[in-house]
From Swiss-Prot:
PANTHER family: MOLYBDENUM TRANSPORT SYSTEM PERMEASE PROTEIN MODB
Membrane topology: Multi-pass membrane protein
Entry-linked InterPro entries: MetI-like, MetI-like_sf, ModB_ABC
Similarity section: Belongs to the binding-protein-dependent transport system permease family. CysTW subfamily.
Pfam families on file: BPD_transp_1
Known role: Part of the binding-protein-dependent transport system for molybdenum; probably responsible for the translocation of the substrate across the membrane.
Record key words, sorted: Cell inner membrane, Cell membrane, Membrane, Molybdenum, Transmembrane, Transmembrane helix, Transport
Species of the source: Haemophilus influenzae (strain ATCC 51907 / DSM 11121 / KW20 / Rd)
Protein name as annotated: Molybdenum transport system permease protein ModB
Amino acid sequence: MEISAINLSLSVAVSSMLWSLPLAIFVAWLLARKNFYGKSLITGVIHLPLVLPPVVIGYLLLVAMGRNGFIGKYLYQWFGLSFGFSWKGAVLSSAVVAFPLVVRAIRLSLENIDIKLEQAAQTLGASAWRVFFTITLPLSLPGVLAGLVLGFARSLGEFGATITFVSNIAGETQTIPLAMYSFIQTPGAEEQTARLCLFAIILSLISLLLSEWLSKRMQKKLGQGNVAD
């Protein structure tokens, strides 16, 4: 059960970050570069998972994306896609709770980029897409990586939304936190609980240290760029 929970946790965390990254980059760019009506409201909605109880998030996902949910039922009828009580639902839960952290890190990185660089490229005839992929995205890459690391760490620790939305099924939805929950309720399973706890602490600490290193690297690069200007 331990190895299965560890492998599933890593798979869920990586998958949730890869699937949510394109949307996170787009949303971060939209919030950093555009002014539009309702921007504050959208920002608040995006950051709701940071303040809502995870159980509430899980319930909302169940209502919306469950097999009988107002979105999930059409996904199941038309494409045979079901999120409830499957590892895909665990990926979705992790992606939702980690999404604000990824967006915030990328947005801060974008806001620190000198917009004059983008304007100069456009003046020289570069298209908006070319400016984004050759200037904006490369310069924001440290922030993107930092956001991914933070989101990965948050996904590893997700419990409430996952157990509410997809239950606690060994080998299918039972990630490290859910496996620890099961072990805690099992007499004589203290050793297994301690091993999973230690693994989670080490992995989370490595993720946070990596995120901090990437943030400092980003600040150093931006500082060098300002000196060069």
